[in-house]
Amino acid sequence: MIVMFQKPRGTRDFLPEEMKKRRFVENKLREVFERYGYKEILTPTFESFELIAKKTGEEIRKQLYVFKDHGGREMALRPEMTSPVVRFYLNELKNLQKPLRLYYFANCFRYERPQAGRFREFWQMGCELIGCKEPLADAEVLNLAMDGLINIGLDFDVHIGHLGVLKGVLEKFNVSEEEEVKIRRLIDKEDYDNLKIYLTQILGEEKKELIFEILKFKGSREVLDELKEILKDFPKSMEAINNLEEILEFVIHDKYTINLGIARGLDYYTGMVFEIYGKKGAKQICGGGRYDNLIETFGGEPTPAVGFAYGFDRIMMNIDDLDIEEESILIIPVKKDKELIKKSLIIADKLRKAGKIVELEIMGRKLRKALDYANSRGFKKVIIVGEKELNEGKVTVKDMITGEQKLIGIDELTNF
């Protein structure tokens, strides 16, 4: 038989075992978000094209899934979650007392070339802290992003930077906003050859060298002292360094690297930025930072905000085999008899209400074939329901690992 249809390129089907792992990790991350007081929200899968395109960045704009609805309105599938969350905030939440702590788990779409860790439908899980400009807010988001990964037992590296450091230099060099955006995009793509050419063209050799010196700053918190010496004549850059130092005062984990080469691919970040890398598989598993102008750009009052998103699929690629034991029970009526089946249903219902995972043999298999099925599916226990045993108020419980069988009273089943 020829299968007529295949899943679209860049998408995936998830088998039950994979879904069990994904739900386990999702719930472990939710635990941490909710311990920090974040509340879950969800936005539509598609938004107006204008909203999505406004501050997304040139590279991602090229990857949008865009369509016109029956009313001729131009729509786009969401490529990330921050812009939709800001739209949601402006529509529904702007009058609430600040700060607002929000989190989401949602599928996003980009027409990317499918490869390891990159899919056309992928999942983001993240948090947004809206309405607080204090360094403590940035630190909270950093702590939260790290705590979530610690809670799932992931080994990772955190790199923290600040866009204000480079911005302060570029402003003093009279670089236009358009030129700055191009510089940031080249940095984000790590296209340093073209960056050198472009900076030399617009600034000259000496200024280009200073910018490259800044981008190479990487290490422990102490590198900021050296950076201050180099940038002491750049007041706005010094403000950014001081802001970063204040943020780091409140970061409770010392597992981070200062990295001034982080630019982030989205156009809305304004201050502290960070990226988290896994130790294997797809490398970057999380990114975030401060975006104080985005809400105003979308027509709201000036409102500070900071947030992050995990690449959920990339997290899954970095996780070793999870030991998620869920003991399921198969109930087998020994023959296709209505009364036996009804009794089996009553037993199944009782066990499910006691919190057990129970399946009923519904194919009408003979006992031996039903046991073979149980073995192939990995059931550790089966309950065999026979007429004789039922008349005594009992059933046979078989341990599929040891082969041991014993009669147990129906009233005792919830305790076995």
UniProtKB/Swiss-Prot annotation:
Gene3D superfamilies: Anticodon-binding domain, Bira Bifunctional Protein, Domain 2. GO terms for biological process: histidyl-tRNA aminoacylation; L-histidine biosynthetic process. Its main location: cytoplasm. GO terms for cellular component: cytoplasm. Its EC number is 6.1.1.21. Keywords: Aminoacyl-tRNA synthetase, ATP-binding, Cytoplasm, Ligase, Nucleotide-binding, Protein biosynthesis. It comes from the Archaea. It is found in: Cytoplasm. GO terms for molecular function: ATP binding; histidine-tRNA ligase activity. The keyword Ligase applies. InterPro entries: aa-tRNA-synth_II, aa-tRNA-synth_II/BPL/LPL, Anticodon-bd, Anticodon-bd_dom_sf, His-tRNA-ligase, HisRS-like_core, HisRS/HisZ, HisZ. CDD domains: HisRS-like_core. It catalyses: tRNA(His) + L-histidine + ATP = L-histidyl-tRNA(His) + AMP + diphosphate + H(+). Belongs to the class-II aminoacyl-tRNA synthetase family. NCBIfam families: hisS, hisZ_biosyn_reg. This is Histidine--tRNA ligase. The lineage of its organism: Archaea, Methanobacteriati, Methanobacteriota, Methanomada group, Methanococci.
